Amino acid sequence: MKPKIAITLGDSAGIGAEITAKALKSVFVRKACTPIIIGDIASLKSYGFNDKKVYCIDVPVGKKLKTKLPRPTKAGGVASFKALQIASELAFEGKVNGIVTAPICKKSWHLAGIKFTGHTDYFRKTFNYPDALMIFISKNINCALVTEHMPLSEVSNFITKKKVTAVCKNFQKALKLIPVKNPKILFCAVNPHMGDEGAFATEEEKTIKPALKKFRNVTLLPSDSAWQKYIQGKFGGIICSYHDQALIPLKTLSKSPVVHWTYGLPFIRTSPAHGTAFDIAGKGIADASSMIQAILFCAKLSVKSKK
């Protein structure tokens, strides 16, 4: 039996409905799963979706919003968050096997008074999965983050021995699930030159190195050297200390669409690795390849997790 995958449409002012409509036309997607769509269905239909065989849960965003130019709005935040809540309820009740989330707008959530910084933060705090791990997957890259959406000035405060240990443990488990044959992992230092042995920074010496002593297959390197070695294919995964340390090389060097995967939840949750793209929303030119891969990856892992 095909896994049931809940697909949320994200912020209705963005490209979520468009990339979902395009993904639902993929033969591979329809063979891989039974989709359940949650969000503003009118937006989905505006991109030619009319398949009555697909079960939809409508979360209307309102006519007033649709007359405005694509931008962050309170209404968009409320609707996208409600869709996520519905999908989460279905997943935790076992009514779906996985969730794929189209992009939300964090500013819209902020305008709506929603305190979470994104999907991953919502799952961690609402359902008490503090160690749920943000991972990015493509054909040639498997990358995990220690810290995520925060000011760069605060990154070092969040890199603790406990956090580093949890990330390494979960990333090892995630790589086995994919599966990745090469178990060796690279860890990108926070500072240039790894702080030169404490000469100008101490995070590596005081925090990261002591935590990594427990892991024989994890190697700490300056981030430029780490990415260079990783792309040579000598390691199965790479851990980055902060967001852009991962996303810049990831989007530059990936040989296929990138998928975001939240590992450590009792179900599979993925998303395309891009945002709402307000600048092209409504123009019909959005690339759905990352969304398609997110659905296929979610379906694949959902089948594995059921066994």
Question: Where in the sequence are the language-model features?
Answer:
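Active-site glycine-rich loop that binds ribose-phosphate moieties when present
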Residues: Y122-P130, M150-A174
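Beta-strand-turn-beta hairpins that frame and shape the catalytic cleft
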Residues: S138-C143
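Contiguous, glycine/small-aliphatic-enriched amphipathic segments in soluble metabolic enzymes
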Residues: M1-H119, K161-S241, Q245-V259, Y263-T276, ...
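Short secondary-structure boundary/capping segments
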Residues: I135-F136, L177
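Glycine/threonine-rich beta-strand-loop-alpha-helix active-site module
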Residues: L111-L133
